[in-house]
Regions:
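NAD(P)-dinucleotide binding in Rossmann-like oxidoreductases
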Residues: 100-188
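Active-site rim elements
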Residues: 64-69, 98, 176-182, 201-209
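Acidic/polar loop patches that form or flank catalytic/metal-binding clefts of enzymes
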Residues: 86-93, 119-121, 145-149, 204-205
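C-terminal helix-rich "cap/oligomerization" subdomain common to oxidoreductases
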Residues: 192-229
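Predominantly a Rossmann-like dinucleotide-binding segment in NAD(P)-dependent oxidoreductases
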Residues: 3, 8-102, 229
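A general structural signal for well-ordered alpha-helical segments in protein cores
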Residues: 13-14, 76-77, 186-194, 216-219
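Short glycine/proline-rich turn/loop motifs
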Residues: 59-61, 171-175, 196-201
Length: 229
């Protein structure tokens, strides 16, 4: 088996959000949005490095696979496909380097993805001092909107809020991820792999190789598209 691990797979709030969407809490979905939480990019929170030193790191070199699109938009691709339950038809990519001019890789990127019945907007940035609002997933449907709160500490104790009323800033329903914990015996990577090997049951959808190949294809299409500007 080829197994792909994502930190977001182990956030109960993200799984809860997908569960509610699949149950039709906000009706037919037409838009999905996700961006990474606060980040100023690689090496921003440890030992201080000069611009010259940072520029020599592969993270900031496009030819080496650096840049915020591959670093952070990847999370959005796997989550978007999972939440929407569809495969994409096309991807439009945009990238720019606003604050990390010592390298040629982008520090901001976005993907707009077209699905048969929906769209998704996925962002990856190394320029966010403070998000200002929850980075999601945020999902819009015919009956309202759903917001997965970040909750700090990688989504632990986070809520999922559902809005049904027009112009309302107060959610109609609030679900605590504490009430919907990860499955017993499958709450981390090791347990999930052991469970799969012992029972033969499929891995979580976000860890499936085929699903991740679709994510890779979306990123590749986004990179190619961004170079056409």
């Amino acid at each position: 088996d080829c197994i792909i691990n994502w930190p977001t797979t182990w956030q109960a709030s993200i799984r809860l959000g997908q569960k509610l969407v699949s149950e039709g809490v906000i009706g037919k979905v037409y838009r999905f949005q996700f961006r990474n939480p606060d980040s100023l990019g690689p090496f921003s929170y440890g030992q201080v490095m000069t611009d010259r030193q940072l520029g020599k790191e592969w993270w900031h070199q496009e030819a080496a696979g650096g840049g915020s699109m591959l670093d952070y938009c990847c999370y959005g691709t796997i989550l978007s496909n999972w939440y929407l339950g569809e495969k994409p038809l096309g991807v439009y990519g945009l990238k720019a380097n606003f604050n990390h001019r010592f390298g040629d890789a982008e520090d901001y990127a976005s993907l707009m993805v077209r699905y048969p019945e929906a769209v998704s907007i996925l962002e990856g940035t190394w320029n966010t001092v403070s998000s200002g609002y929850d980075s999601g997933p945020i999902v819009w449907g015919e009956k309202g909107a759903l917001i997965v709160e970040n909750g700090g500490d990688h989504g632990i104790h986070a809520n999922v809020s559902v809005y049904h009323d027009r112009y309302s800033t107060t959610p109609n329903e609030v679900y605590s991820s504490d009430d919907y914990p990860l499955p017993a015996g499958r709450s981390n990577l090791a347990e999930e792999v052991f469970h799969h090997l012992e029972t033969g049951e499929p891995l979580h959808a976000t860890m499936d190789l085929n699903n991740n190949l679709w994510s890779a294809a979306m990123l590749d299409a986004g990179l190619r598209s961004s170079r056409s500007l």
